[in-house]
Amino acid sequence: MLSQIWILFTFMVCVIASKSKSDGLKFEITKKIPISKCKLKALPGDMVSVHYTGSLAENGKVFDSSLRRNEPIQFKLGAGQVIAGWEQGITGMCLGEKRTLHIPPELAYGSRGAGGVIPPNAVLDFDVELVDIARN
């Protein structure tokens, strides 16, 4: 019985660890693409297109959304064009996958905040969907 409990505990730790990065980024896969249908995963160097909605974790206030503009953001993954939490959270996503990224301040805008909309030291939540990958 004790060994079964230990196995269950170990499994739960592995599941939790697989969904967070060691440096504080946490994410939840909200739309998983089956392995058999995941033909392309986002890798550094890829040009990716992402739909997103960003909100403040403390109160859920939405500060930006590409869905409102009906235009995904495009950027080169790994080139430092977006916050570090996005770089880490989008790497490895399958085309069509959706995730919720829970990004601590040190992987977002830190003590400076951003544009009068994101306060200093804010934890951010982003619902993201990988809509395109262009690989050279």
Swiss-Prot record:
GO terms for molecular function: peptidyl-prolyl cis-trans isomerase activity. PROSITE patterns: FKBP_PPIASE. Residues 45-134 form the PPIase FKBP-type domain. SUPFAM superfamilies: FKBP-like (SSF54534). One of its GO terms (biological process) is chaperone-mediated protein folding. Pfam families: FKBP_C. Gene3D superfamilies: 3.10.50.40. Coiled coil: none annotated. Belongs to the FKBP-type PPIase family. FKBP2 subfamily. This is FK506-binding protein 2.
